[in-house]
């Protein structure tokens, strides 16, 4: 992983939503998930529209360098955790006899195989070829804009944890509107950019996440690209490990002391007696004040499932 990241190409970018190049820096973090501290990546917020994104970000040609070999491990239907997630995801779909569905970011097609067994006509697209692929599932590899589908073809299009990874969400919204039928739904899971997990606990999967959507920003994307927001669900239930902000008090306290990320993640920092006492109270605050169910209740949990309808005028 380290040798691959040495070849990473970074690029500055303007706001995908409004095109403005004016932004303010919010915070910077390295790749905390895979503990690579070579680069720190800056999360910025557009001054014009408020959209948050990564800049500089990995270029599209070098994105494959930041996906660990095990990134798609155990994402087939045989894995019990994945099958439970497929059941929960399917609950968001409408009941359509012989419906045609496209799953963007389908990996090896595990969710599509699950749906095929329930009568759906299944199609998939993913920009990474995985080591496994379900048999009998029609999957095109590459980015969605590079793959063609008929206009008004699909009843439902899904994207589970995808839109935050793509360089130009605007292009995806435009294409999805064209290939979705006039009564179709676009159903997608994204991190909640207003959540404790995302905004305050530094837990976004940076640099693989390059856009940080908030409800008001999703509504603006929908308006610009011919959709209406039908429903937004705030949920921590789709994954076995909830996207909770637990730990934010500890992390933010340590960062306020200018302790490097490598020491925070490896728990190798030294504190004075006074700071140790303060750190102890931060741990108490994390335990008492932050809970996944409360985060869901107050729309502060890390994930949202968004359902968009085409806006037919």
Labelled PLM ranges:
Residues 39-43, 160, 300-306:
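Short hydrophobic/aromatic beta-strand or adjacent loop that forms the aromatic wall/cage
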Residues 40, 71, 137-141, 202-204, ...:
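Short low-complexity, flexible loop/linker segments enriched in glycine and/or proline
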Residues 167-175, 185-309:
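S-adenosyl-L-methionine-dependent methyltransferase catalytic module, highlighting the catalytic core
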């Amino acid at each position: 992983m380290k040798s691959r990241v040495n070849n990473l190409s970074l690029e500055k970018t303007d706001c995908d939503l409004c095109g403005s190049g004016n932004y303010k820096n919010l915070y910077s973090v390295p790749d905390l998930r895979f503990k690579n501290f070579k680069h720190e990546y800056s999360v910025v917020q557009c001054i014009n529209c408020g959209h948050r994104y990564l800049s500089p970000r990995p270029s599209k040609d070098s994105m494959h360098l930041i996906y660990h070999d095990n990134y798609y491990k155990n994402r087939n239907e045989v894995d019990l955790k994945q099958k439970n997630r497929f059941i929960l995801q399917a609950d968001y779909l409408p009941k359509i006899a012989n419906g045609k569905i496209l799953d963007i970011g389908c990996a090896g097609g595990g969710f599509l195989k699950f749906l095929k067994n329930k009568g759906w006509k299944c199609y998939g697209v993913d920009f990474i070829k995985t080591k496994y692929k379900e048999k009998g599932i029609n999957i095109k590899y590459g980015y969605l804009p590079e793959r063609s589908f008929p206009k008004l073809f699909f009843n439902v299009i899904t994207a589970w944890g995808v839109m935050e990874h793509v360089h130009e969400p605007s292009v995806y919204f435009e294409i999805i509107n064209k290939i979705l039928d006039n009564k179709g739904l676009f159903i997608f899971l994204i991190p909640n950019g207003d959540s404790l997990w995302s905004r305050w606990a530094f837990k976004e999967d940076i640099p693989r996440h390059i856009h940080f959507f908030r409800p008001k920003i999703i509504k603006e994307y929908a308006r610009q690209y011919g959709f209406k927001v039908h429903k937004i669900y705030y949920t921590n239930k789709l994954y076995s490990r909830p996207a909770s902000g637990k730990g934010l008090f500890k992390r933010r306290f340590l960062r306020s002391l200018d302790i490097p990320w490598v020491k925070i993640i490896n728990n190798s920092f030294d504190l004075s007696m006074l700071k140790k006492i303060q750190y102890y109270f931060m741990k108490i605050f994390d335990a008492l004040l932050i809970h996944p169910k409360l985060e869901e209740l107050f729309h502060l949990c890390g994930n949202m499932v968004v359902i968009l309808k085409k806006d037919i005028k």
